[in-house]
Regions:
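Predominantly flavin-linked oxidoreductase catalytic cores and closely associated redox partners
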Residues: 151-311, 315
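FAD/FMN-dependent oxidoreductases across multiple families
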Residues: 299-383, 387-410
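N-terminal FAD cofactor-binding segment of flavoenzymes
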Residues: 46, 66-116
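N-terminal Rossmann-like FAD-binding beta1-loop-alpha1 element of flavoenzymes
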Residues: 26-57
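Short beta-strand to alpha-helix junction loop
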Residues: 81-82, 128-147, 219, 225, ...
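A short, basic/flexible loop-to-alpha-helix module at the beginning of a structural domain
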Residues: 3-29
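C-terminal helical "tail/cap" subdomain of flavin- and related membrane-associated enzymes
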Residues: 7, 385-515
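Helix-loop-beta segment of a Rossmann-like dinucleotide-binding subdomain
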Residues: 119-138, 175-177, 189, 294-296
């Protein structure tokens, strides 16, 4: 193997500007990010504060024009939006991002007042809450982030390269970089060759080469081979937790029409523990609605229009069906099968090499219907900054623990309903009791703004789940309905069929968002 110092010139080069350099200390010459995903881009924005140079290596060819979806993001054409925590986190990482997205058509709105949420048979009350989310297509969000990250003078992004594996020290105790292979000849690589040349990489060969770095961050998503690479180096296997609800999604786009859900930006319908159907409709920047229908445990939503409409009409609330029935369809339906929520427990690994960490979906990937993936990636990037503030010593173990703390709440929220399905193993008594508490909380929240706000702060990853057990909230939940102060006018609901693994949910670790 030709182990070359392909970026030696970059190591000797001191960049004139990085991301917020005044707040961080220099940790090394070069950092390498594997994967140009949203998690990879946000990680690069953080690393740029600590390293003279950051190189992002992406498998896909990246166009400078908006409109396409990366092959590495098969769910990219489906409904997308940012939770409050995700929007705020990305703004902290890349100041001005929110205004930039809104200027390009993203919809900023109240996630309670401008959204209808239905959990099982329980429809949440609506009021102006001050919790602002952001709705935009995945390509728009990624494009705006990519542009801002590439504006950083010490960040280079190259596309069209496969990652063959890690380069390690002779004793295998430290990662020195990554082995990369050019996927296409120079004449077919388009704009990629420019980035490769600036990074010192070959642009006219398919030979394997090595990119050296002081720190390597794997952001290659669910398809990450990091666990395999470490196993081949003799390290222990990484524990894998999987909850597979056998989810399938079909998304159609419809042109927005006056008189159809004018007072809503989002309509979200989650299935109860005994149910297998759900749906979501979100306004997007191009004047369309994206309507995604979900089926679990083997039920597959239909893509043919009349059957799609019939499936939408079977959902508990009518908004999604109203769009599908009254608005003009645009384009072709998109199908996506989700292989199950998966959490690689890197924080429990007994041994690992130094100078290598894994982030984003490569750590934990969630059922996309809950809209948590992008927000989790942003929060993990902020956690990476806190880890880097403490230097490079023992970084892989510290980063794994920090990322696990971020992943705990969205993992529990995303897998909760799936674990209450009759086909799943029975849960312990304590968890079942807490499930009942959350069921009752949501029914009570229809008439109680404080409960509604408390639950939505957890849902938006702004508060830790144990906050729902605060004494004042427990008192409001358990108070008989005839004594409860009516702060909202809402119709009585039938007995709820609500999903939520509350036993784990209420024990999940706190997420330090602002530290």
């Amino acid at each position: 193997m030709n182990v070359s110092a392909v970026l030696a010139s970059g190591r000797r080069r001191s960049m004139s500007r990085s991301a917020d350099p005044g707040t961080s200390r220099r940790l090394g010459d070069q950092a390498l990010v594997l994967g140009g995903s949203l998690a990879g881009l946000l990680s690069a924005s953080v690393l740029a504060r600590y390293f003279d140079r950051v190189v992002i290596v992406e498998r896909d060819q990246l166009s400078s024009q908006l409109g396409g979806t990366r092959r590495g993001v098969p769910q990219g054409r489906h409904s997308h939006g940012l939770l409050v925590s995700g929007s705020q986190s990305m703004e902290r990482l890349l100041p001005g991002l929110t205004d930039g997205l809104v200027a390009r058509g993203a919809i900023r709105g109240d996630l309670i007042g401008r959204a209808r949420w239905c959990f099982g048979d329980v429809e949440q009350a609506r009021f102006d809450s001050g919790l602002e989310g952001l709705l935009a297509s995945r390509p728009l969000i990624e494009d705006e982030i990519r542009r801002r990250v590439m504006d950083l003078s010490n960040v280079v992004l190259i596309g069209g390269y496969d990652i063959a594996g890690l380069a390690v020290s002779d004793d295998r105790r430290r990662v020195l970089g990554a082995r990369v292979v050019l996927r296409k000849p120079r004449e077919e690589a388009g704009s990629t060759s420019t980035g490769a040349a600036s990074a010192g990489l070959p642009t006219d060969s398919i030979d394997e080469d090595v990119m050296l770095a002081d720190l390597v961050v794997d952001a290659t998503g669910r398809g990450s081979r990091a666990a395999t690479w470490l196993a081949e180096l003799g390290y222990p296997a990484v524990r894998e937790d999987v909850v597979d609800a056998r989810m399938s999604y079909v998304t159609r786009r419809f042109r927005q029409q006056p008189g159809v859900l004018d007072d809503l930006d989002a309509d979200v319908i989650g299935s109860g523990p005994g149910g297998v159907r759900g749906g979501v409709a979100l306004r997007q920047e191009d004047g369309t609605w994206t309507v995604s229908l979900a089926g679990g445990f083997g039920e597959r939503p239909p893509s043919e229009l009349t059957q799609f409409q019939a499936f939408a009409r079977s959902l508990p609330t009518p908004g999604v069906a109203e769009i599908a029935l009254r608005c003009e369809p645009v384009g072709e339906p998109q199908f996506f099968h989700y292989p199950g929520s998966r959490w690689l427990r890197w924080e429990k690994l007994a041994d690992r090499p130094e100078r290598f960490t894994v982030i984003g979906d490569a750590v934990c990937s969630f059922n996309p219907v809950y809209g948590q993936g992008m927000s989790s990636a942003a929060l993990q990037a902020e956690a990476l900054a806190r880890v880097l503030d403490q230097g490079l010593s023992n970084l892989p173990a510290r980063a794994a623990k920090a990322f696990a703390a971020v992943a705990a709440t969205p993992w529990t929220l995303a897998t909760g309903a799936d674990r209450r399905h009759p086909s799943q193993p029975a849960k312990p008594l304590v968890e079942r009791v807490l499930d009942g508490y959350l069921d009752r909380l949501l029914v009570a929240a229809q008439h109680d703004r404080e409960l509604t706000m408390a639950f939505n702060r957890v849902l938006n990853l702004l508060a830790a789940p144990p906050s729902l057990l605060a004494p004042r909230l427990v008192a409001r939940v358990l108070r008989p309905a005839r004594w409860r102060r009516q702060t909202l006018v809402a119709a009585a609901s039938p007995a709820p069929r609500l999903g939520g693994d509350v036993g784990v949910l209420l024990e999940a670790r706190s997420i330090p968002l602002d530290s």
